[in-house]
């Protein structure tokens, strides 16, 4: 079953770019990644083919990269959910 997380942290997009440089560019199982600024900092929405693939990426790649760049505490998802439907109507890229 597809799985999604929504995380918000009081960090900058530049900091997230530093983390991105340390993890695989196209991790196995990632379907969709949305990242943007919020009033608090940065929010990230990720959709995965399965919770197992999300958990594996977090444990093997993202948690170590976050610990290296951000330190503790590592931001925990605000929300995680089993996904019943994913619809992408066209590819959108924003710099």
Language model segments and positions:
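Short S/T/G/P-rich N-terminal loop/turn motif that feeds into the first structured element of a domain
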Residues: 1-45, 49-63, 70-95
């Amino acid at each position: 079953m597809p799985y999604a997380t929504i995380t918000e942290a009081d960090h900058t997009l530049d900091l997230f770019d530093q983390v991105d440089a340390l993890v695989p560019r196209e991790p196995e199982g990632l379907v969709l990644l949305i990242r943007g600024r919020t009033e608090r900092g940065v929010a990230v929405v990720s959709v995965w083919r399965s919770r197992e693939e999300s958990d594996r990426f977090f444990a093997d790649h993202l948690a170590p990269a976050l610990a290296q760049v951000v330190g503790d505490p590592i931001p925990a998802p605000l929300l995680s959910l089993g996904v019943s439907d994913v619809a992408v109507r066209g590819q959108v890229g924003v710099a």
